[in-house]
Structures are given as C-alpha cells and as structure tokens.
Amino acid sequence: MCIRDRRCTPDVGVVLLTGNGPSPKNGGWAFCTGGDQRIRGKSGYQYAQITETGAPAGDDASTVDTARAKAEGGRLHILEVQRLIRTMPKVVICLVNGWAAGGGHSLHVVCDLTLASRECARFKQTDADVGSFDAGFGSAYLAKQVGQKRAREIFFLGRSYTAEEMYRICLLYTSQSPR
C-alpha cells in the first residue's frame, strides 16, 4: 500500500492524495467516488479480480479475487486506510479535482487538509442513496469538524456541495482555480 510505504520513506515529507483524469468516457474528473456498488457483496466490498491491463475482471461480486480476499481477510479495509492516514507522521493533503462522493467524501474528511478546485470539485455523501453506512472514521471526524447537526445533514440528505459551500462550512482549507 502506497500510504504505508510513504510513512516509512525519510525523503517524503508530505503525502498528496488526488484523483485521476480526465475520464475517457466524458472528459470529467473525479477525486474518488467511493466503493463500486457493482462489486458489493453480502459481506461488503470485495477485492475484484484484476486483468493484465489493471482493469477489474467483471462488473459484479462474482469476480472476487478469492486468493487476495483470503490473504486480506475478505473485504476491503477502508478503516485501515483511514487509520493509516490519521496516524501518518507526515501531513496528508487531499487535492479534490472533481467528485468526492461516498467513501471519497469520507477520505477527504480524514485527511489533514483539503484543497479543492473551485470549478470542478463536488462533494456528496451517498450512504443514504445506496443503503450503506460509513464503515470508517468519516462520520465521526465530520461531526467533530462541523458539528452533529451539520454532519447529519451531510450524511442523511445526500445533497451535493460545491467547493465554495464546503469552504464556508469549514471542510476545506481553500478552493482554488485549476491551472
């Protein structure tokens, strides 16, 4: 895992998390849109089999990488990823260049700082939309940062927020125009 490696690398002082893009489908950008609902099995998100090109082998829970699932304990461990971020002895900055939705929204919440594109960044907690819940630190940290009532609004209503709105409710350090 990259985060675990960077933790122990002495010449790394800051960890930057950002998304990939632009999308070959529509040219859009995303920071992280959370778990792929197509591969969510009865016991949660599973490790999908990966092809030689690095793409998932299929579109549903039937393509679980059983060897990796056995080695990793069966499910994706987002709590472990969030724990590594929160206990990182280096600053972890989240650079949101598109959608931060669901687990991606929780990921930005647990980072030390979030910088976002004023034009492209969008934030949304999707738990209510997909019948899921935050399996990590996201909801607790969110409530600590913005208060219980505002956190419940974000989690329960599932509305989307711009970078400017997130800045106003103190979830962003700053919003920037892209270069």
Predicted feature locations:
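Conserved small/polar residues in nucleotide/adenosyl-binding loops
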Residues: 1-5, 173-178
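Conserved CoA-thioester-binding segment of acyl-CoA-metabolizing enzymes
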Residues: 1-22
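Hydrophobic/aromatic residues within transmembrane alpha-helices
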Residues: 17, 36, 107-108, 166
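Glycine- (often His-adjacent) and acidic-residue-rich active-site loop
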Residues: 19-81, 131
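CoA-thioester-processing core
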Residues: 81-87, 95, 101-155, 169
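Acidic, divalent-metal-coordinating active-site segment for phosphoryl/phosphodiester hydrolysis
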Residues: 159-164
